[in-house]
Amino acid sequence: MSNQLNTMDIKEILKFLPHRYPFLLIDRVLDFTPGETLHAIKNVTINEPFFQGHFPVAPVMPGVLILEAMAQATGLLAFKTMSDEPSNDALYYFAGIDNARFKRVVEPGDQLHFEVKMIKERRGIGVFTGEAKVDGELVCSAEIMCARREIAK
């Protein structure tokens, strides 16, 4: 494998993920190796719409959105593994999750780091492990599955 650093800025992320505000939860990819790993970040600010109701007095990022961001990172790794070009003909859908565990809260001002690893891919189903961390401290871990599906037109 090459030692070349592979990154993605928000413009490239938007080419691969169908998500848009307020549901796009990946800001940048710091490094990836197709078929192996991807390291992405989400900058969590007080301006996130979910903080209005979760919780106004003590804002905490909902765990389900941490998992969704992790799933978006797996989708990026899947796209980069299967094809280097974005496709308008197929998407990777969040297909399953196992062994999700939460270890600490995520608050405004935190920077979430996602490390996802591809375990296997078979017949369009990818299996990944993922961890989310803040300041090197584990926030969440999970096993995630995503499925490649053609878009009906």
UniProtKB/Swiss-Prot annotation:
Q: Name one GO molecular function term.
A: (3R)-hydroxyacyl-[acyl-carrier-protein] dehydratase activity
Q: Which domain of life is it from?
A: Bacteria
Can you supply a Gene Ontology BP term from the record? Answer: fatty acid biosynthetic process
Reaction(s) catalysed by this chain, per the record, are: a (3R)-hydroxyacyl-[ACP] = a (2E)-enoyl-[ACP] + H2O
The record's section on InterPro entries has: FabA_FabZ, FabZ, HotDog_dom_sf
* Active-site feature positions: H54
Question: Which CDD domains does this chain map to?
Answer: FabZ
GO CC terms = cytoplasm; membrane
- Its EC number is 4.2.1.59
Keywords from the named record: Cytoplasm, Lipid A biosynthesis, Lipid biosynthesis, Lipid metabolism, Lyase
Subcellular localization(s) per the UniProt record:
Cytoplasm
Q: Which family does it belong to?
A: Belongs to the thioester dehydratase family. FabZ subfamily.
Q: What does this protein do?
A: Involved in unsaturated fatty acids biosynthesis. Catalyzes the dehydration of short chain beta-hydroxyacyl-ACPs and long chain saturated and unsaturated beta-hydroxyacyl-ACPs.
Entry protein name = 3-hydroxyacyl-[acyl-carrier-protein] dehydratase FabZ
